[in-house]
Amino acid sequence: MTNYPKITLPKECDVVVIGGGIHGSSSAYYLTKAGMKVVLLEKDTIASHQSGRAWGFVRQQGRDPVELPLMIECNKIWQGLEKELNADLEWRQGGVLFVARDDKEMSEFEGWINDTKHFGIETQVLDPKGVEKLTPGITAPGVGGIYTPSDGQAEPKKAAPA
């Protein structure tokens, strides 16, 4: 059995957050920023489980329309988070590309764009040459794709502990 160091928890707090992954850590951060006394509990080290293995995509593209308002705001936050935290999160706003393997999938992608265009996300429909232009040296199988340049990615093992 592992011997963990003994810690002294505060006698009082406003909120207890259980789990030190990206959601728990960010919840604790913003609650603290709002003036709450927060205790963050994690059974291991921060970002040592699912958040530490995730790819770190912050994407609007392909989301359920119900999720989009939240993801649009999250994307805005991520764009300035390194500066706010004074930390290197390896944030890259390089976009997200979905490649359609067949006409049916391409039609589904185009349907998503049509269903979500009122949100103002700048998703581009690409033919195979457009996909290849975004991925130099890689011949993309398929009939095209969609690309959202405002989507990005951060390094989860750096973001959660920050």
Where in this protein do the model-derived segments appear?
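Glycine-rich FAD pyrophosphate-binding loop
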Residues: 32-52
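Glycine-rich Rossmann-fold phosphate-binding loop(s) that bind the pyrophosphate
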Residues: 19-21, 43
